[in-house]
Amino acid sequence: MEVNDGERVVIAKPVASRPSSSSGFRTFTELLTDSVTVSPQTTCHEIVDAAIRPKTLRFNQPVAASVSCPRAEVKGIGNGMSCDDDSDSRNYVVYKPKAKLVSKATVSALANMLQGNRQQTWRQSEAVSYGKSVSQGTHRAGPNLVQKVPSFTESETSTGDRSSVDGYNWRKYGQKQVKGSECPRSYYKCTHPKCPVKKKVERSVEGQVSEIVYQGEHNHSKPSCPLPRRASSSISSGFQKPPKSIASEGSMGQDPNNNLYSPLWNNQSNDSTQNRTEKMSEGCVITPFEFAVPRSTNSNPGTSDSGCKSSQCDEGELDDPSRSKRRKNEKQSSEAGVSQGSVESDSLEDGFRWRKYGQKVVGGNAYPRSYYRCTSANCRARKHVERASDDPRAFITTYEGKHNHHLLLSPPSSSTLPFNSPQLSKQTI
């Protein structure tokens, strides 16, 4: 019992340490007493304060803060304060802005604006260099010619058959996606028989022609009368009411108030009349519409072609398998008529109204073949017209199918044809 009443002695295991010269040697009892009496919390806080101290980025303080710093040193030395402690409470906090989320439309719009500025700068530089080369005479043609055309936009049809700005007629026969270009490269060949010239056309994102590479040389002259570009002419897109003077003549044989049977007259200058007369004298007739003229012969009716070497052709109309099969069946079950005529006015009328939907160059004939369809609703009659290879002034017309309606136009006299009558030519053309 006496042992239990006595004071309990706590014995702590001493930690081995090397003696230092400053503290000297100490006895085991002193070391034991120090280990029991020392507060572990104070030692822990001192170690943590010495080990973990955040590093801050300080900016230059105003003059007032720097002036007040010595006062803090004088007054706060006894309290353990310093100039650094005072400046810690006055630090400036810099906030970094956060990025905002924007929609995809905004991002694409900004990208297009940036790309547009780059394209405009490139075009201006290319235009200046191209103008200098032309003025100095260094831009000459050759067998393999590379042309930079930054400002020209070449529109093409579904098949790419188009008379381009160089004066020749081209037919697109393929395209391929190449590295380093977002748009595919188009391949063209000259439509003239036995002409080996080909060209490659590369376009920019906006659709403009950026590079044209020619291969070979033309073995023929430029076509004398290329067809007008379909993109720039709105004259073949419909009909409208003719002037009253034309309706009073009764040249079309219909009611003058009926807009369906009235051709579209668009040229109103004497210069265009002279140019049209010159074209007719050369055997090349350019008309924006198809109109009716009487025939004096007993052969099957025919119509005229434009007579120009162009390879415009609606691929959707000519190369559609279902349409081609239907035309073959109609051709076998119907009476196909073939007639020949001349370029005179009496060879351009068969009493029906036709709409030209394409033309293409066929093998063995240097002149294109034109394709027409009847404008009447639900009528499947078609025809194609081509020039004779031996006689350019003769036409061969082939009809496919039968008309399921009566004549649309009454045959007028040949003197009422617009480009044969001087009176009508002066009033309407």
Swiss-Prot record:
Belongs to the WRKY group I family. Residues 214-279, 292-348, 410-429 are annotated as: Disordered. It is found in: Nucleus. It comes from the Eukaryota. Leaf promordia, trichomes, atrichoblasts, fertilized eggs, seed coat. One of its GO terms (molecular function) is metal ion binding. It comes from Arabidopsis thaliana. Keywords: DNA-binding, Metal-binding, Nucleus, Repeat, Transcription, Transcription regulation, Zinc. Signal peptide: none annotated. Its main location: nucleus. Residues 254-275, 295-313, 334-345 have a biased composition (Polar residues). GO terms for biological process: epidermal cell fate specification; seed coat development. Induction: Not induced by salicylic acid or wounding. This is WRKY transcription factor 44. Residues 159-223, 343-408 bind DNA. Residues 410-422 have a biased composition (Low complexity). GO terms for cellular component: nucleus. InterPro entries: WRKY_dom (IPR003657), WRKY_dom_sf (IPR036576), WRKY_plant (IPR044810). Coiled coil: none annotated.
